[in-house]
Design a protein with these regions (language model features):
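Aromatic-glycine hotspot motif
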Residues: 1-155
Length: 155
């Protein structure tokens, strides 16, 4: 429950930031200082790019969690290269990002009671089970919420 609460909290914080920000600032790519947990290759993004990345990650994590809940480790290794955003993404990403948040929460609810011991390796954290991937979602949102704040502090 605390992992899901973390997701809801970070999602709400990102939504509040978006609501309080002029849309023209959200598409500006800004080079930010290195943040803990953020790859150097992710430091020159816009807010829209950050939301696109979160959307891609939520979709990928959802697929991994559903597979693990079925007792099957996904065959393809998780890769940070696979979750890079489009450089040309715009405000049209806002709704797909929100849907991805809804979808990952639905996946979490559907897989929470799994007894599967299947694991899939995260590129940084190693093999994780369903619960480990669940825990990662809120932490990941928090890293990128701080990224959004850093981007907007420089626009």
């Amino acid at each position: 429950a605390s992992f899901t609460a973390d997701i809801a909290d970070e999602r709400a914080r990102i939504a509040a930031i978006l609501d309080a920000t002029a849309p023209d600032r959200l598409g500006v790519r800004v080079l930010i200082p290195r943040l803990r947990g953020l790859e150097d290759s992710s430091r020159h993004w816009s807010v829209w790019m950050t939301l696109d990345h979160l959307r891609i990650v939520h979709e990928a994590v959802g697929r991994v969690m559903r597979s693990l809940a079925d007792g099957v480790a996904p065959g393809r290794a998780a890769s940070t290269a696979d979750v890079k955003p489009s450089a040309t993404v715009d405000g049209g990403v806002a709704l797909p990002y929100e849907r991805s948040c809804d979808d990952i929460l639905a996946t979490i609810a559907a897989t929470a009671a799994t007894s599967s011991r299947a694991r899939h390796a995260h590129p940084w954290f190693g093999p994780l089970d369903v619960r480990g991937w669940h825990a990662l979602v809120g932490m990941h949102l928090g890293i990128h919420r701080r990224q959004v704040e850093a981007i907007l502090a420089r626009t």
